[in-house]
Design a protein with these regions (language model features):
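Vicinal oxygen chelate
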Residues: 11-14, 60-121
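Extreme N-terminal starter segment of soluble prokaryotic enzymes
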Residues: 1-3
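Conserved small/polar residues in nucleotide/adenosyl-binding loops
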Residues: 131-133
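Core segments of cupin and vicinal oxygen chelate
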Residues: 8-51
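Active-site beta-strand termini and strand-to-loop segments that position acidic
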Residues: 43-47, 114-117, 127
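Short, charge-rich, low-complexity interaction segments located
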Residues: 50-53, 57, 64
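Short glycine-/small-residue motifs
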Residues: 52, 121-124
Length: 133
């Protein structure tokens, strides 16, 4: 068994697709109309056959309060791994991405959190090698 698709609830599939492809450089894998919405998945260009990220409309009545509570408590909805957090932080800041926390060490990882403009906080994480520790 393996994870095939994971989802993130977004307030606008179009806006989310634009942010995640233009800022994070993810690629559209599937874009299939389904009623009022789309089955819209993205993949990392580093792993095009890997786990797909579904941009799930947050239309369910429970979604908005859940997302608002997570954001109010500064809890990231999900986490993406990067090789060089400091470089990615600077690249994204230069593209206008708003970070809610700057890069910081947390044990054997370094993390930073940004706002995806679609109602979520997203954590970037770099696993530190023995050289960094």
């Amino acid at each position: 068994m393996k994870i095939y698709v994971t989802s993130i609830m977004v307030d606008s599939q179009e806006k989310a697709c634009q942010f995640y492809t233009e800022k994070l450089c993810f690629k559209v894998k599937h874009d299939v109309p389904v009623g009022d919405y789309r089955w819209l998945t993205l993949v990392s260009p580093e792993s095009p056959e890997g786990v797909e990220l579904l941009l799930e409309p947050d239309a369910h009545p429970a979604a908005q309060p859940f997302k608002a509570a997570m954001k109010a408590d500064l809890i990231p909805y999900t986490s993406f791994q990067v090789e060089d957090l400091d470089a990615e932080y600077e690249r994204l800041k230069n593209l206008g991405v708003r970070f809610t926390s700057e890069p910081m060490r947390a044990g054997k990882v370094k993390v930073a959190v940004f706002d995806d403009t679609c109602g979520n906080l997203i954590q970037l994480m770099q696993v530190l090698s023995l050289i960094h520790i």
